[in-house]
């Protein structure tokens, strides 16, 4: 049996651009890809914190250090510049692997610069007013 678990998460990134006429995908700053262990072409889920939209697409590598989070193609109808998003990738792993898998969690600021790295998918962004759910157990 395989289990599907969170592998990577870029938490509360700010969408910098949306291009309806570009062929699908999400463009992500190469620094963020490295930090989150994401590869070009990898499947990601996008959760729009601003409006609740959820979608899946694939990664395109963006210019390193640019802070780009670009929504391309039809998804630009759902996700807009300035929206806060969570980008999540998952891995299918065996039961044994699942018990030791530690996700790569990347926290960013309003300019999509890395402000924290970790493995706790429920940890709030460092320095923010966010709180962990009182029912959540720390990783």
UniProtKB/Swiss-Prot annotation:
NCBIfam families on file: panD
Residues at the catalytic site: 25, 58
Enzyme class: lyase
Taxonomic source organism: Streptomyces coelicolor (strain ATCC BAA-471 / A3(2) / M145)
Oligomeric and partner information: Heterooctamer of four alpha and four beta subunits.
Residue list for modification Pyruvic acid (Ser): 25
HAMAP family documented for this protein: PanD
Record-level Gene Ontology MF annotations: aspartate 1-decarboxylase activity
Protein name: Aspartate 1-decarboxylase
E.C. code: 4.1.1.11
């Amino acid at each position: 049996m395989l289990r599907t678990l969170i592998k990577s998460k870029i938490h509360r990134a700010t969408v910098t651009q949306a291009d309806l006429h570009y062929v699908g995908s999400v463009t992500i700053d190469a620094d963020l890809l490295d930090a989150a262990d994401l590869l070009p072409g990898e499947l990601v889920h996008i959760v729009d914190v601003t409006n609740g939209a959820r979608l899946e697409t694939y990664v395109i590598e963006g210019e390193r250090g640019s802070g780009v989070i670009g929504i391309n193609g039809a998804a630009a109808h759902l996700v807009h510049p300035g929206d806060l998003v969570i980008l999540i990738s998952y891995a299918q792993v065996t039961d044994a692997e699942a018990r030791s898998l530690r996700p790569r969690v990347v926290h960013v600021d309003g300019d999509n610069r890395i402000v924290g790295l970790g493995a706790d998918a429920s940890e709030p962004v460092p320095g923010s007013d966010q709180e962990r759910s009182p029912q959540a157990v720390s990783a």
